[in-house]
Amino acid sequence: MNSSYTAIEPDEPLDSPPSYSANDHNTTTNTTTSNPSTQPYVNQPQADQPQQPGTSSSFEPRTLLQRLKESSHPIALLFYIFFRVSPIVTYIFGTIVIHQFTSKNTFILHFIVLILLVAGDFWNLKNISGRLLVGLRWWNETTLIESENGNGNGNASGQVGESAKDFENVWVFETADPNRYINPIDSKVFWLLLYGQPVAWVVLGVLAVLKLQFLYLLFIIVATSLSMTNAMAFTKCDKFGKANNFANDVFTRAAGSMFNNFNPFGR
């Protein structure tokens, strides 16, 4: 209380010391009575704390439809998710669904549906989803290479030698303008499912070997080869580092964890 009065002491006359004593009692009573009035304002945020869950509801996990609305190409993203997930789901639960309709030729119908879904996934990813979601596309083309196959001895017509025609298989990678905006939701879903599907097929292939399902293993080999082809092609096509950084991060973490587990000197 003394420090508070020193700030206002020069404003009061020096010849009236009793007024200070009187004011001391008044101010002390005022401060003591004013404290209860100020305490509700201090404790008022504590009373309002039950309203915080209402404000935290905006931070709840968003649903799939809400994320699709934030996508730049929601229809393309929806078809991409469908074609990437449906072959694996059909492989696991397809026979159960087919048995609900017919019990004849179950394996043949299941195999045909799987082939159609894998082919549709390969075409959609290669031609539509990669171009719209991340601005990448690749294709394969065959070029003609002409090479002279002569021995250097000319003939009467002046021809030096015959030209041999050969064909070369060329991979063409196309990347969009680096200044183009890539939606982060589209990019994350694209790269996650691009690398996640081959891993799922490998796991299912191991299970097929353990169950001695060699016909299904043949299909899994085809599906894995198509999925790995798309994964490697889009990784090479991405020359601006969107996939390379993601793949390098995953591979370095996996290699580091394996090295730490098998390193006898690190323990």
UniProtKB/Swiss-Prot annotation:
Superkingdom as given in the UniProt entry: Eukaryota
A GO CC term attached to the entry: Golgi membrane
Region named Disordered: 1-59
Annotated transmembrane regions: 78-98, 105-125, 189-208, 212-234
Cysteines joined through disulfide linkages: none
Entry keyword set: Glycoprotein, Golgi apparatus, Membrane, Transmembrane, Transmembrane helix
Compartments, record wording: Golgi apparatus membrane
Entry-linked InterPro entries: TVP23-like
Residue ranges of coiled coil: none
Compositionally biased region (Low complexity): 26-38
GO BP of this protein: protein secretion; vesicle-mediated transport
Name of this chain's protein: Golgi apparatus membrane protein TVP23
Source organism of this protein record: Candida albicans (strain SC5314 / ATCC MYA-2876) (Yeast)
Gene name tied to this protein: TVP23
